[in-house]
Amino acid sequence: MQLMDTAKPHENTTKKIEYWWQTPVLNRRAWTWEDARNVKHQGEWWQNAVIYQISPQSFKDSDGNGVGDLNGIIEQLDYIASLGVDAIWLCPIYESPMEDFGYDITDMRDIDPLFGSLEDFKRLLAVAHSMGLKVMLDQVWSHTSDKHPWFLESRQNKNNPKADWYIWADPKPDGSPPNNWLSAFMGHSAWQWGPERKQFYMYNFLESQPDLNWHNPDVVDAILERAKFWLELGIDGFRIDAPNFFMHDAQLRDNPVRPEDAPLPDGVAPDNPVVRQLFKYNFCRRETLDALKPIRELMNQYPGTVGLGEVTFCEDSIALASEFVAGDERLHMAYHSGLLVDEPISAKLMRQMMEKVLSNFTQGGDCWIVGNHDYGRLRSRWTGKDAQGNPYPEKFYHMIATLLLSLPGAICLYQGDELGLTEARIPEDIPVEDIKDPFGQALYPAIKGRDGSRTPIPWQGDAPHAGFTTAEEPWLPVPESHYQRAVNLQNKDPNSLLNTWRRLLHWRKKQPALEAGNLELLDTEEPIFAFIRQYAEQRILCIFNLSNESARYDLSGYPGCEETKGLGFTTNRQGNTIEIPGYSVFFCNMPLSCDYQLKSN
């Protein structure tokens, strides 16, 4: 669970702060991406999977109440399968007061009636599996709802069986909170008074989301018992929400003030008051690595399942995420906020990103993500202008899809990004009084919240509410601009962004070098970003023009290079020089007999 209105650029030239995760805890041998892919080719599906993220409230409403549900997802599973993805990840569907879209849970083992029933979920699981789709569930283990039976018992007094299941602390002598920690959501004190116990309880997000005490082994056992319930049903894995928030400093020491010249944490809106502090004691703790061990031990009992951790909202998320997957006693995969940035996207940024990922994820486990339910829409974050001041053309987003699907590792694709949906605007598309996100409600207008990336999927361009619901009003409105990007309209257009994603996803499955190969970065100059992917008998040269102006690349060092056709991009080759139009791509297959010479272009 994160809370981004906008994210900072990846590169930061201000004062460097050192954190424990920037010095690897484990000794790591020299390693290549091919090592990790060998695991996949021995039967692990997740190493290079494309995972389609579904926000159930906004996907498809089947019963006319204005909110998406499980049966609505079942109705559209054939659409998801047609994309060529490998798995679906469902955001929380458990019993909840819905104060934070289901990330405030009261029962981790049952379905909220808003979405359907446990029988509906079992049917979804069966239908998805029949279509070759894996199913992953969101798991929220850092906190619960304040209406959860555990917390209702814990708050009564200091002596009950659940008294130490949450983080309680006495006030200071003057009655103020135990320390200076701030809520990541609200930006004020992370402590709320509990009059029954005459103590404060800690929360990192909303006051109604008290943090569980992961220092208590009984809490861990209870969480794993609930995880086992879903594994026994036959699900294929978990997306684990905010695992870097699991552990806190048991001494409750104050966080230091962030120096004015210190960089901001990755993916955190600069207007969020929480950035006034360094995240040293309240989360991102070293002891979290030990907390991952029992999770992995449980999942090892269910071969073929995967644990995918969300590691954002921290300083240097790439380095920290890599620690969460190092060795065989932690998570299988983790995603970071490396590409959850605002523009500009450039060859320099991409090279820096890849160099950092390759040097940190030395044992695999990287998962790429460019958008989700907590961040602004990809198309609205990367809305830059070319040299003439014109907005990025449509072809830019086709190029970005190709780039993402060419990188090593797994990929998360957020619903609607394949359609090129833009961020819903506040107040133009969503009136201020209709903001649903508590983060936006608390901090608007400095931060508009996350509603803009959670509006309903447009299924039909000529239907009320774009075919999402038959209700008079959906839970969030469908922006007017989204109707023209509806699924039924893009299905008919072979050159649509939707069909580009489909074409690329199905093509990628047939390319061992892209699915399983190592990656060699090439030394290029703006605006060219290029690399070579190789696995077994296949070697592919991948060249991207990250500008709207034509660019040339010298192919004389790559004899026998044959251009890959059918990807939807045009280039002009004259001898050993390839001219790549703006925001276009050149792929070529290189014979293994080619003794290529890396040269600066």
Each model region followed by its residue ranges:
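Loop/helix patches that line or flank the sugar-binding groove of alpha-linked glycan CAZymes
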Residues: 16-21, 25-31, 45-47, 251, ...
